[in-house]
C-alpha cells in the first residue's frame, strides 16, 4: 500500500506540474485576448450586477435559484482552506512574491470562469424532476460539433468530478476541520465527524435550494468575518506594510533569489514565486476546473452571458479579496521564516495563526480555526452539488441522487477520523483531470464565447 501511495503521489506531482499550470493559465490568457479583454473591461458591471437587488430574485428568466445564490453556492465550494492554508504555503515555499502571481493567475482566470459558466447555462437541460442540469459535461455533449468526441469528454469529466467530490471536496475538508478543532479546542475527531455528517446531511438532503439558501447566508458572513479580522491584523502592523509590499513585488520579479527583511530566512526567486503562486491561485479560485459551472447552470437568468459575468466575480472575491487579506496579514506581521519549538519552519495554517496572533493574541488562533471550519464546511456543501450533478449525468437519471447525498454525508465522517493520503492524492489527480476536457471544450468553443460576449455589449451600454 505504501508503494502504491508513493506512485499515486508521483502521478499527482506530475499532473499538477508546470505543463498543467501553463495550460490552465495559458487558456485564460488566450480567452482573454480572444474576447478582447471584455471580462476585464466589464468587471465593474459584473460586480454591480452581483450586488444588485435583482441578483437576489428569480424575476428574470428560468432557473432553480437566484443569480446571487448560484454564485454563493459556487463560492461555497471555492472559498476553502486554500484561502488560509494555501496562501501561507505558497508564501513559504515560493516567497511572498507568490501573492503577485496569484493575482496574475486570477486576472486571466476571470475569463476562464466566465466562459465555462456562460457555456454551462447556454447548454443546460431540464431533468425529469423539473430541475436544471448543466455544466461542462452538457456543454461538451451538446456544444461540440463532433458528438462522439464530445460524449467521451463529457463522460470523463463527470467521472473525474464524482471522484474529486468525495476526496478534495469532502474528506480533505473534513480532515482540515477535525484537525483544526482538535489542535485548538481539543475536540475529539469522532465528535467533529458526527456533527459534520449530521449537519451536512440535514442541509444536503434538501438539494440545491437548501444548499443555496444556506450558502447565500454563510458564505458572505464568513468572508466578511475573515476579512474584518484580517484587516485588523494588517492595520495593527501597518508600519510594516510598506516594506512588506516592497518585498512582495521584489521577490515576484527578481531573476536572482532574494530574501531578508520581513521574510526571515526565506529566500526565493521569480521562478519559485511564479510556480507556487500560480499553482495555489488555480487551486484557490477553481478557474478552468469546471466545477463552478455546474452550479451556475442552476441560476435563474434570461441570458447566459449575464450570469457568466456574475459567476465570474467568484474569482475576484476568492483571490483578489480573501487570499489578498491572508497574504498581506502574513507579509506585514513578520512571521515568514519563523520556526517552532522543534526548530522547524512554520508553514500552512501555523503561519496564518502566527500572523493573527501578533495583534489578536490567543484569540487570533481561535479566529483562524473558526475561519478554517466555516470555509471547509461550506466547501463540502458546494462540492456535494457538483458531484451529485456529475453522478446524475453518468447514470442518465436523477432517481439515485438521494443515495448519493446520504453516502456523501457519511463519507465526511471518514475524512474527519481517518488518514487517507492515498484517496486524497487520487482525488487530487481526478481534480486535475477534470480540467483537461474542460480546457479542450473552451478552446474549441472560443469563437462562440467571443461572439456571445460581444453581442451582449449593447445590453451593458444600455444600463
Predicted regions and their residues:
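Transmembrane helix-loop junctions in multi-pass membrane proteins
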Residues: 3-4, 34-39, 82-87, 165-178, ...
